């Protein structure tokens, strides 16, 4: 971690601040457009592969980057076409593409806890599971103040295990999620609170 703790207002403009800003600007590229379409994002991604040598493209969130070429009203067909375009881009440019896709509204179970979503809870349901190579769940447990990362799908079993999971806690001093090992004190303030 470049900062070794969370920066404060007094850090703005210091050498360390400038060094960190330079690192971010040299290693992260934000595609900022007035209107996002899948084709325009992939075109800009291809440009960044050629000019900057990027190896990873993150689309966050999925529902804000629309595929305007799709004329099909069927959400499953739309999702399949969307994922196919991304797969073709990833193979052509040898780039990892990560799509952040939020589930539809999740309801509480009989114990009052929010149900854990699956890939089928994303709009376009089964296509997310069928057409993607990998699927990870990131799910918060507000009571335990932990975040679970669970493998929902691995296409090639030598790359991971379906159902594998790890738990993390937010460490405010560093601004990082760290592996969860002990109970968290009840008065700890979490970033989503």
Tell me the role of every PLM-derived stretch:
Residues 29-92:
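Phosphate-binding/switch loop-helix module in NTP-utilizing enzymes
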Residues 58-59, 95-102:
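Structural recognition of the conserved hydrophobic beta-strand(s) that form the central parallel beta-sheet
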Residues 2-11, 15, 23, 38-57, ...:
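C-terminal regions of RecA-like/P-loop NTPase motor modules
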Residues 18-29:
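A short helix-to-beta-strand connector/capping loop
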Residues 64-66, 104-108:
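Short, active-site-adjacent cap segments at secondary-structure transitions
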Residues 29-31, 98, 136:
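Hydrophobic/aromatic beta-strand patches that form the interior of the parallel beta-sheet core
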